[in-house]
Amino acid sequence: VYKRQPLFHAGAYYVQEASSMFLEQAIKAYVKEPVRCLDLCAAPGGKSTHLASLLPDGSLLVSNEVIRSRSYVPAENIAKWGRPDTIVINNDPEEIGEALPHLFDVIVTDVPCSGEGMFRKDTDSTGEWSVDNVRLCASRGRRIIHDIWNALKPGGILIYSTCTYNTEEDEENIHYIIEELGAEALPIPTQEEWQITGALRFEHPVYRFFP
C-alpha cells in the first residue's frame, strides 16, 4: 500500500523491518563524529538511506552493490533521499579492500545469506533452502569479510548482519571475525522490552530478532 503514496516516492520515508532498524542502535552507540562509512552489500538501499540519516554531519557514505543489475535500485532510493554526501558504486569487496586500504571508519556488511528470515513472508523461499546452501552462504560471508577487512581503518567499526537464523552464518562467522581477523565484539545497548535474543553459540554479544 505504501508504494502508492507520493511521500514514499519523494523519499520522505523508507519502510524496513524492525531488525533492520537496529542498525541505528549500533551507530548511536559508537559513532560520535564525522566518519567515512561503507555500506558494502547495499541493495535495495534501506540501510544506506538509514545511515544517511544517522551519520553525523560531514560524514561520507559509500553505498556499494556487487551485482550491477541490483545497483540501480539503491542508486534510485538514495537519489530520492536527497543526500549529497553519498556515493553509489559497483565493486567486488576484494577490489575495494585492495584499492582503499584503511579508508573507512565504519563498514556495514549485511551479507548475502540463506534467507531463513524470509520464510514467514515468502513461503516459496523454503523450497530454495538446503544444508549445502547454508554452508555456501557461510563460506561466502567469511570471504566477503576477509576481502573487505583491509579497507577498515584500525580501530574502526564493522557491523555484521544477516537475515537468517542458523549459527553457521551468524555466530560461527562472528567467531571467525574475532579469532582470525583479530576483531573485538562490542556490546550494543538494548532494552528488555525489545525481546532481543542473544547468542546461541559462543559468548559473543549477538542480537537476534525472531518474529
Describe the residue ranges of each PLM region:
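S-adenosylmethionine
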Residues: 3-211
